[in-house]
């Protein structure tokens, strides 16, 4: 669910792992979202029943100051292969400064 009326949530990716559903997405504010403090960030939520969700945006990860993804992390895409799961995402400037991936530990 939205935290406030000015928040935008986009690019959801739903996956199931054992008895939990995970929803990965990007979110942003309505003001100064291209390069500022309201820029895109990646978050996730989990649920047992697809109705009640626990949102955990602050746990996923954050860019290091002055890194290629320090100001923006957007448009997550999830890939599972073997027993590993990876998230690919765009960095600053909607991916202009690069894109990356991280292993998800669920």
Task: Cite the ranges covered by each PLM segment.
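Carbohydrate-active catalytic/glycan-binding domains of CAZyme proteins
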Residues: 1-106
